[in-house]
């Protein structure tokens, strides 16, 4: 059977591995390196360069050298306006889509096409190593990649001539590599800080089972951002001295970016580094040179906000997994950016233990992808991988509240159902509004789609039973079905990639949910109280109509007055009241009064019925001849 390779398609570097003799092996490229820069360039002669050779000529050819393309893949232009200004090549808006301009060829590329060139090189190098054509692969993506980004990655594989058998999350792949030979159960935290993305996953691993307990992350945080901090520092310092902004010169920007990356790497092992860029620019007075010293302390100061941003997803993942830091057995570092001493110190401070450095952070994801490829090819047995959905899914219910059906970090595939009803009398259709997010109110969450179920027989509100079912398969495709249990009629909607969200929306939802938790809870409680008040009014009116003349005039007047007062306080259809304008203290008091009045009326009706029945039954009761309709009064006490 043909070999299936595992590929880590990274922002900065990529890597390919394969299972050989039951063990994963990283495949060196044609140049002899185990990782390949994710860089593609086109020369003025039209030649295509990929990898190290493309990276080496970037300074001389900045406008035709494409790097960090992973930040653009699967995204609309309005989602990457900030990133578009941080690269030396032109990023164009073509009908809302991202295109990369290549002046050397006089054409524009989609990001998928550039990524495909990197994948094609990895495929060719793997084919030479294995001595056979490679046509199938497992490719990794950040855990927080949305559906369009995942699909774009699959498209890149297709362009490269690969059948992508599976897209798996990078932290999950890393856990496979770490835990392949582990027999004892361990709870591990994978801290994955790469070139352009940051993921945190907590998993239970052991004896072939890899279960994701929680995942969190930031899709706009990585080594590139650390480089950018150095670039800005160098550029601002130079501008202060010379009055020239080097970032406006594409060639100078490329040189600054390379120098920043080199300085960042050096500062992981030394306390200071020299940055020398002769002839960085020129004026009428002659050439200008950049010569500066950067210390590790200054670098950490420049990047303090980025380092702090790494803290939040770790804390969120621990909270979602319902674990304390003491329950984490091992911390596995993934991605080249985890070599930064300040990052390692942060991990140690957050989790109270030294990180496990037994795996190569540049290769571990590709190794994990190769293991998953081995599972799919039948080479690796007894491996069970259980992943999760990153955000809660639900529907909008009365009062604009989001009712969650599948909580975030639920293991997929999964299927869950809830039964809902109508909100008004005689309602013949319901609109199902599918939502994703962590906020209490529907308006604050991501709308995934709406559909309508028609043909519900007219009935009093609360009578029809509408069963709403959420079904997520292993590929992350969400199907929502609404079925009227009375008639059997149903309607459904298929939402491909329920976790598809624009730039940073996932992180924003979680952050806002934390910040606004108290306010959300209070607002939800108010809406629930209002709904309960409306329901109580409806029940009271229904009871009055059903009992008719059995209710005394005084009781009827009292109930009618209480209903009117409660309706006036919460607002009616004709005169709606904003939720914040309602006095909920008075509403609760009126509800209590109305409830007591209903109990009183109910007791009176039963007493009247008993007294009228009691006249005829007392004589027959004395003779001992009990009929079928005899009612026997008995006292009983509840035992606890």
Swiss-Prot record:
Disulfide bonds: none annotated. This is Chaperone protein dnaK2. Residues 627-640 have a biased composition (Acidic residues). Residues 605-640 are annotated as: Disordered. It comes from Thermosynechococcus vestitus (strain NIES-2133 / IAM M-273 / BP-1). HAMAP family: DnaK. The modification Phosphothreonine is found at residue 197. GO terms for molecular function: ATP binding; ATP-dependent protein folding chaperone; unfolded protein binding. Acts as a chaperone. Belongs to the heat shock protein 70 family. Induction: By stress conditions e.g. heat shock. Pfam families: HSP70 (PF00012). Keywords: ATP-binding, Chaperone, Nucleotide-binding, Phosphoprotein, Stress response. The keyword Manganese does not apply.
